[in-house]
Amino acid sequence: MVRAKRKLDHIEYALSTGQSRTHGFHDIDFVHQSLPNSSYETITCETKIGELSLSSPIFINAMTGGGGEKTLHINEQLAYVAKHHNLAMAVGSQMAALKDESEAASYKIIRKVNPNGIFFANLGSEATVEQAERAVDMVEANALQIHLNVIQELTMPEGDRDFTGVLQRIEKIVLNSKVPVIVKEVGFGMSKETMQQLASVGVTAIDIGGQGGTNFAAVENERRQRMLSYFNNWGIQTATSIIEATSTNNNLSFIASGGIQTALDVAKAIALGANTTAFAGYFLRILMEDGIEKLVDEIDLLHTDLKFIMTALGAKTIEELQSVPLVIKGETYHWLTQRGIDTTHYSRR
């Protein structure tokens, strides 16, 4: 019951705290192309995460489940939207259903709505190999997300305080999983060193989950009597974290998430090196405040606008979009310079 109540708290406070932190994409400018040699009608948006083929570089990221009828209804609606647009979708952490079988329906509903969809199971880094297998089976998942949420746990009144052995547990899950494993942050970004560690144990896909979207430190602080306000602005901005990711030179697939709300955000994230992008809080707010049809329409517009931007840049495919020239400036440039990451190749390609 405590876990289910927490799930509902997360929805309430995620909506009330909003997405007030900056994601850094304002520091990224495309180099205008006056002769793009492109046509809107020939633009294609297919992409891949590892060996998973996706029809769109936009997917619905992990949000909820395990909070009774309300979370079941949210996942049901999101699965409908995913089916309508042929988008991949992740569920929220399934530990609630592993601890209480009665909560499993709030996750299983996605397969009932969209039997042939691409879905990602989701567990925290405390999960065992056996729990990972059960989570995958629960939703007949095509991949498994393992989320890293140290700052959220530390801020959570009842959260974990021991994070030893996490990399070793992830390695065991990777070695034993029958589906690809995606390791994701939850809004605090990832450094290049973290991604190198993950690659060293066999992880092949990473969701950088940068600062700029839903602020889980602020969410958990709303549930505390004594706020840990020093965590509210903690983390690496989304744009910066994508560049940190690509600087590792590992054969990894990268998912950009963290405050992405517009087609321009999507285009910039991909041009920086992401293979795809993920939306969570922005989609949840539209769904809860304006309804499912408004969300369907918004995703239509995102795809239309992305193709307009790709046409303007002369990028006919997602792969070509990853190679267009851009300029990195401001705080993002300053951070990357201090971190010893050369950005000149972005502007000269």
Swiss-Prot record:
Enzyme Commission code: 5.3.3.2
Family matches, as InterPro entries: Aldolase_TIM, FMN-dep_DH, IPdP_isomerase
Broad class of the protein's primary localization: cytoplasm
Any Gene Ontology CC annotation: cytoplasm
Organism of derivation: Bacillus thuringiensis subsp. konkukian (strain 97-27)
Protein name per its UniProtKB record: Isopentenyl-diphosphate delta-isomerase
Stated role: Involved in the biosynthesis of isoprenoids. Catalyzes the 1,3-allylic rearrangement of the homoallylic substrate isopentenyl (IPP) to its allylic isomer, dimethylallyl diphosphate (DMAPP).
A Pfam family assignment: FMN_dh
Cofactors: FMN; NADPH; Mg(2+)
Cited CDD domains: IDI-2_FMN
SMART domains referenced in this protein's UniProt entry, alphabetically: IMPDH
Lineage, top ranks: Bacteria, Bacillati, Bacillota, Bacilli, Bacillales
Name of the gene: fni
Subunit record text: Homooctamer. Dimer of tetramers.
Positions contributing to FMN binding: 62-64, 93, 122, 184, 214, 258-259, 280-281
Molecular function GO labels: FMN binding; isopentenyl-diphosphate delta-isomerase activity; magnesium ion binding; NADPH binding; oxidoreductase activity
UniProt-annotated binding residues for substrate: 6-7, 152
